[in-house]
Amino acid sequence: MPALPPVYTPSGAPSSVHAPPAVPPVPVPTQPLRSEYQTSNDACIKRLEELNIAPAAKLYPTPTEPGKCGVEAEIQTNVFGIEMHQDSLFYQYSVNITTELKNGKEVTFTKKGKDDFVVTERHDKCCAILFRALGDYEEFFKTSDSCLIYDGQSILFSNVDLFQGFREGAVKTKYMQLDGGEMDHKDLKSLPCIKLEVFPTKNPAVKFTREAVARRATDSNLDSVSLAYQQILELALTQPCLRNTARYVVFDHGKMFFIDPLGEGFEKCDVVDVGDGKQVVPGLKKTINFIEGPYGRGRSNPSVVIDGMKVAFHKNQPILDKLKEITTQPVEHGLKGLEKDRCAAVIKGLDCYSTYGGRERHHKIEGIHHEGARNARFELNDGGSCTVAQYFEDVYNITLRYPDTNLIVSKERGNINFYPMELLKISSHQRVQIPQLTSAQSQKTTKESAVLPDVRQRLILTGKNAAQISSDNEVLGKMGVSVCEDPLMVKGRSIPAVKLANAEIGANPINVKDNKWRANRFTRPATAPNVWAMYVVGTASTRITLDTLKKFADEFAAMCKSKGVNMPAPADISLIHMDAIESRLYDATKANCTFVFIITDDSITTLHQRYKMIEKDTKMIVQDMKLSKALSVINAGKRLTLENVINKTNVKLGGSNYVFVDAKKQLDSHLIIGVGISAPPAGTKYAMENKGVLNPNVIGYAYNAQHNQEFSGDFVLNSASQDTLAPIEDIVMHSLNEYQKFHDGGLPRRVIVYRTGTSEGNHGSIMAYEIPLARAAMRDFSPDIQLVYIVVSKDHSFRFFKPDLASLASRPQATSSTASRHSAMPAAPKAWDLNIAPGILVDSIVTNPACKQFFLNSHITLQGTAKTPLYTVLADDAKVSMTALEDITYKLCHLHQIVGLPTSLPTPLYVANEYAKRGRNLWNEAVALNNVPTVSGPEADRLKELTKSICYKASGDLTGRRVNA
C-alpha cells in the first residue's frame, strides 16, 4: 500500500477510531452562498440601470502642466528605462500540457494554481517540458530563428508565425508527445507520454514598434489601451529566471526570489532567521510602466520599475524540527490544548512531502491531530484495526522514533488522512501567510523586511544583476530591446512647510520645526462632559493602586484645563475586574455619564472591540489606553504621551486641536470626502452564511460638513465581490445632507473625493460605473456642483531616494543620547535622516503620460524606506491646476490632530480608513455576539439593512464627531 489509508469514523466503526480534529473556524457550507453579482462591477451597473444612466466613457481627464509650487529637488528613482532598437511582430499562442497516470487519471500541468508550492511546481514542470520540446520539435518552433517568450504555464509569444504555411481552413493546432524519461526533471521520469498542444489564440498579432507602443500602451481612452505590450516586456525580462528554476523562484505580479542569495551577490545580513522555522530572504518585484520620460509632456516610454524586498519563507525542514522552533514544549511527547492549536495555525495550509513509500508524495496540511501514532487507530480492510505505529512497522518496516508525537492531518481527494510527523518535511518555496504569523512573529518579520533606503538600493541593484535584467538577457537581445544600467534621476520639487495655527486666519501660529509640532491651547476646545468616569480594567495580577489612578486622573484633568477643556473631577474612579467592566459601563450610561476613560491591562486583548460596541450602542464615548502607557506618565513623567492622549480626548468629544493657515480660504465651499475600504480577511468569506450574506467589504468615509478642517464620518457594507462602489451614491448623498445641515441649507461649490482601495487596473471601471453614481447623487442637490475624483494608492513599486544617499548612510549623526559620557559614539543614521523629507513631489518624467498624476511624500518615514502615495485624477470638472491640487492635498496631510506629525495620506482619507477598520471590528464583534439580524431580499438591500444594525448613523450625534480618533 503506497500511502496511509484514510483515518475517519465510518458508520459502525469502533470507538477507538478517532475522528479528525475540529473543522476550521469558518466552514464552507454544503451548498455555498454565491454573490448575486456575476462581475466585479455588477452592483454599480445595476444601480445605473435603475437610474436610467448610461456608463461613462473610460477616459482620463486631460493632463495639465506640472505644478509650480516649491523649489527644484533632485530625486533618485528605482525606474530603469527600456530602449527599443528594432520593430517586431509577436504572435500569441496557447499551450496545454497533459499526461495520463497509471490509474487513468489525466493531469493538466498548465492548470492555474493558487498555493505557492503548486504554482512553482507547475512552473518548473511546464518549463522543463516546453524547453525540451523546443529542441525535439525545432522545425515547428523555428527555435534557432525565433524569439520565444513563455510565461511558464499556458501562454507563448513568438516573433515568427508558427503556423505559416498551413493551408487555409486547416485546424491550426500542433500536437506533440514527449517522453518524461528523457528529461532531467525527476518528477517527470516516470511519465512515458507527455502531451503538448500549441494553438493560436484569437488575439491579433502585436505590432511591437516604438510608435505602436507609445500610442496603444498609454492612450487616455482606456478602451484603446492594449496590455499586450506590458505583458510581452514583463515576460521577456523574466525569461532567464523562468528557464533556470535551479537558481530562481518566480511568482505572479513580477515577484521573484533567489535559491542561493549569497551566491547571487547578496550579503549575509539579507538572509535572517526569524524563528518558527521561517527565514527572511531577499527578492525583487518588477513592473513594466509606461512613463512620460525625460523629454516632457506628450511622450510615452517603456520602463521597468524594480523594487527590492525581503520576504519570510518557511524553511525546507522536517515538520518535527519546525515545531521545535515554534514551541518550548517537548514535541516528541505530544502537544495539547492551546499549544497544539498555536502550532497548527503556523503550519496550516502548507505543503509537505513524504518519501517512505518509495517515491515523493505531497500533502497539504489541514491541522495537527490530538493523538500520536502509538494510540491512534484505524480500520483495516479485513475488519480489524491497528495503531498507526504498528501499521508502519508491518507495511513499511519503519519503527517510528517518536510514536507519541501528534499526527499531521491532511485532506486528500475528499478524505482526511493522518501521517506521522517525523516522516514529513515542509516543501520549499512557500511564503509565510498572515494567518501563519503570531503577533510577535509579525512584528519581527516586519522589522526585518523594513530596510533603510541605502539597503533597499543595494537590494535593487544586486537583484537586477542577479535576475539578468540587463544586456545578458538573450531574449531581450533577440527582441532588440535593452534596459538602462542606471536608474532615472528626476527633477522633483520640495513644497514649502505648511503653516499651522490656532485659527485659519493665522492667529497664534504654532512653531513647526523639522515637520514636527506641539499645539498648546486647542483651536476649539470640546465641551467637557458633566459626568464622566475613569477606570482601570485588569485581573487579579494587575499591579496598580487606586491612589496611582487618582494621581493619573489629576494630571489628566490638569492638562485638559491647560489646553482649554475644563474637565471636572470624575464622578466615578475605580479599579474594575475585566469580568465586571461591561455591566459597569451600562451602569454609567444610566447615571447620565457621557465619557469614560479606561486604562486596560496590557495582557487583556479581547475587550477593546467590546468597548467600541458599547460606545456605539449607548452613545457614551469610551477612550481606551494601555496600562503600561499610563504608568509611564506617572512613573517616568512622559508628558508627551499624556499630551497625545488628551489630543485624542478633545477630538473624540467634538473639539479641534489645530488647523493649517488658510488665509485664501481654499476650503470654503468645498466638501472633501475620503473613502477607504477594509476587505474581509482571507478565509472568512462564509462567516455569516446562516444570515443570508457573505462576509462584506466595509467602506469607511469621512467628510468636512461641519467645519472646513474637521473630518468625521461613518461606514457602510458592500459586497466583497465588487471592485467598484455602488454605495458611493449614498456616501455622497449623506455627506451633502450633512453639509447642508451646518451651512443653513447651502451647498458646496465643489466636491473633492479621495478614494483608496483600488489599483490602476480598476481605473476604467471606476470612471465608467462608480463616478456616474457620485454625480447622480450630486445632481439630486444641484447640477452645478463640480466633482474632482482622485484615487490614492500605495500599491505600486515606485521608490524615491535622496541623490546623495551613499554619503548620508556613511556619515555619522549626532551622538546618541544613550551613549555614556566617556564612550559617546556617533549614532547610526535613522530612517528619517536617510529618507526623502515631507513635501517631496514628483509630477513628471515617471508619471503616466495619459493622465493627471503625481507622487506626494507628505510624511516623516520612521521605519524602513518611504512608500510615497500616488495620486491619479479620474474626474476633474473644475480643471484644477496641478499646483492647486498638490498644495491642498499636502495641507490636508497636516490635520491628524493626535500626534504632531504629517500623515502619509490626506486626513479625510486617513480618517475614512480608520472608520473602515472600526466598521470591520464592529462587524466582527456583532458576528461573535450573534447580534446580526437575519436579512432577505436582493444583496444590496440586505447589506443596507445590515449596515443600519451596526453603523454610527443610527447613534445620533456620533456621526458629527470623530469617535475613531
From Swiss-Prot:
Provide ranges: composition bias, Low complexity: 10-20
- Protein's job: Argonaute protein which is involved in the endogenous small interfering RNA (endo-siRNA) pathway and is required for RNA-mediated gene silencing (RNAi) in the germline. Interacts with secondary 22G-RNAs, which are RNA-dependent RNA polymerase-derived endo-siRNAs, typically 22 nucleotides in length with a 5'guanosine residue. Also interacts with the mRNA targets of 22G-RNAs. Associates with znfx-1 to mediate small RNA-directed transgenerational epigenetic inheritance of both germline- and soma-expressed genes.
Keyword tRNA-binding in the entry? The reply is: no
Gene Ontology biological-process annotations: regulation of gene silencing by regulatory ncRNA; regulatory ncRNA-mediated heterochromatin formation; regulatory ncRNA-mediated post-transcriptional gene silencing
Q: Which UniProt keywords apply?
A: Cytoplasm, RNA-binding, RNA-mediated gene silencing
Protein name per UniProt: Argonaute protein wago-4
Task: Please note every region of biased composition (Pro residues).
Answer: 21-30
Which species expresses this protein natively?
Answer: Caenorhabditis elegans
A GO term from the CC aspect: perinuclear region of cytoplasm
What top-level branch of life does the organism fall under? Answer: Eukaryota
Q: Further remark, if any?
A: Members of the WAGO (worm-specific argonaute) subfamily lack conserved metal-binding residues found in other argonaute proteins and probably do not cleave target mRNAs directly.
**Where, subcellularly, is it found?**
Cytoplasm, Perinuclear region; Cytoplasmic granule; Cytoplasm
Tell me the ranges covered by the PAZ domain, including all copies: 318-428
The segments labelled Disordered in the record are 1-34
Taxonomy, top ranks, is: Eukaryota, Metazoa, Ecdysozoa, Nematoda, Chromadorea
Give the family this protein belongs to, as stated in its UniProt record. Answer: Belongs to the argonaute family. WAGO subfamily.
Annotated S-S bridges: none
UniProt keyword Cytoplasm, yes or no: yes
Q: Assembly state and interactors?
A: Interacts with znfx-1; the interaction promotes the transmission of epigenetic information across generations. May interact with mina-1.
Q: Which Pfam families match?
A: PAZ, Piwi
Q: What is its main location?
A: cytoplasm
